[in-house]
């Protein structure tokens, strides 16, 4: 059983993608707004009927209904508004995430948690502390989205399908995220060998600004790409695929970092992020990575004491 906490745009889209991909046949939506998860669940059950899917959705306002879940996906939290940075959401969403984390520890103590709430890396830390889970079992959704965006923009410039590109994006899920063209490949050929320097710069800038651009255009943040990305991560966990994906996890010495969640390649399986993969970086890339880590550390230091 999978529980999705938060029935807004990202939560509902994620729930739909989970059903379409056949990740689980029982999905619970939980939200504090009465009627919202129940309405979404009913609509999703109608979708399942039309598509012939073997999945049943339940909506609830009670955290106790996550009992039995081996995977909990947390999409709850305040969303970014036009002109707002992920960092401005810090304190308000920290309280929301910490409260949800305590409920997860109570009702789904053996689960893996995938989190989408921004600012992502800081909220991954808050969730890790609130649940008391091992670092492997608290995974921030970030790199699948950032990597997908990099592949899209690079693919447009190359005139090839984004599916042909294996992208690498490291560091913070935010303004200091660090796409790595030298380690992003098209059949073994790095992007920085296929694109001109100015094209790489444009693709990287478009990747970094993509989320804000979507919010600016339509007045609310992204949901389709995050929903798809979370579902891909959930499938890797539920089916024990041992699939290498980019995610935010608390590092324990990898990349010379300890106790800070950072967007890095991991192997996702039934236990969560069962292995961190260390990418060899050039001196310049290491410097940029460290700058991104410092940005995350600064956010963590600004968290109220009760969330540390």
From Swiss-Prot:
Q: What class of enzyme is it?
A: oxidoreductase
Checking InterPro entries in the record gives: L-lactate/malate_DH, Lactate/malate_DH_C, Lactate/malate_DH_N, Lactate_DH/Glyco_Ohase_4_C, Malate_DH_type3, NAD(P)-bd_dom_sf
Q: Which GO terms describe its molecular function?
A: L-lactate dehydrogenase activity; L-malate dehydrogenase (NAD+) activity
As its record notes, the protein acts as a catalyst of: (S)-malate + NAD(+) = oxaloacetate + NADH + H(+)
Fetch the SUPFAM superfamilies from UniProt: LDH C-terminal domain-like (SSF56327), NAD(P)-binding Rossmann-fold domains (SSF51735)
Matching entries from CDD domains are given as: LDH-like_MDH
**Does the keyword NAD belong to this entry?**
yes
| Residues given in the record as substrate binding sites | 80, 86, 118, 149
Gene Ontology annotations of biological process type: lactate metabolic process; tricarboxylic acid cycle
Presence of the UniProt keyword Transmembrane helix in the record: no
Which residues carry out catalysis?
173
Listed A to Z, the keywords are: NAD, Oxidoreductase, Tricarboxylic acid cycle
Record: residues binding NAD(+): 6-11, 31, 93, 116-118
Enzyme Commission no: 1.1.1.37
Domain of life, per UniProt, equals Archaea
Which purpose does this protein serve, as stated in its record? Answer: Catalyzes the reversible oxidation of malate to oxaloacetate.
Q: Which family does it belong to?
A: Belongs to the LDH/MDH superfamily.
Name of the protein: Malate dehydrogenase
Give the species: Thermoproteus tenax (strain ATCC 35583 / DSM 2078 / JCM 9277 / NBRC 100435 / Kra 1)
The gene behind this protein is mdh
């Amino acid at each position: 059983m999978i529980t999705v906490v938060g029935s807004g745009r990202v939560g509902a889209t994620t729930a739909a993608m989970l059903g379409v991909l056949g990740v689980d046949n029982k999905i619970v939506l939980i939200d504090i707004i009465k009627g919202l998860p129940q309405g979404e669940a009913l609509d999703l059950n109608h979708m399942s009927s039309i598509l012939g899917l073997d999945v049943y959705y339940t909506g609830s306002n009670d955290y106790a209904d996550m009992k039995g879940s081996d995977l909990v996906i947390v999409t709850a939290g305040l969303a970014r508004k036009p002109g707002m940075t992920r960092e401005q959401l810090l304190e308000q969403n920290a309280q929301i995430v910490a409260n949800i984390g305590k409920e997860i520890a109570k009702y789904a103590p053996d689960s893996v948690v995938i989190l989408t709430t921004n600012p992502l890396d800081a909220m991954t830390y808050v969730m890790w502390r609130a649940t008391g889970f091992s670092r492997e079992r608290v995974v921030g959704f970030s790199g699948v989205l950032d990597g997908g965006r990099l592949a899209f923009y690079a693919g447009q410039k190359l005139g090839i399908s984004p599916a042909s590109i294996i992208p690498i994006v490291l560091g913070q899920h935010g303004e200091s995220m660090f796409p790595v063209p030298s380690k992003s490949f098209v059949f073994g050929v790095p992007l920085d060998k296929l694109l001109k320097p100015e094209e790489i710069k444009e693709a990287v800038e478009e990747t970094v600004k993509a989320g804000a651009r979507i919010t600016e255009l339509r007045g609310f943040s992204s949901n389709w790409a995050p929903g798809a990305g979370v579902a891909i991560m959930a499938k890797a966990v539920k089916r024990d695929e041992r699939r290498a994906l980019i995610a935010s996890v608390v590092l324990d010495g990898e990349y010379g970092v300890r106790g800070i969640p950072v967007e890095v390649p991991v192997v996702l399986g039934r236990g969560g992020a069962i292995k961190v993969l260390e990418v060899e970086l050039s001196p310049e890339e290491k410097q940029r990575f460290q700058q991104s880590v410092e940005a995350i550390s600064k956010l963590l230091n600004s968290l109220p004491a009760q969330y540390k």
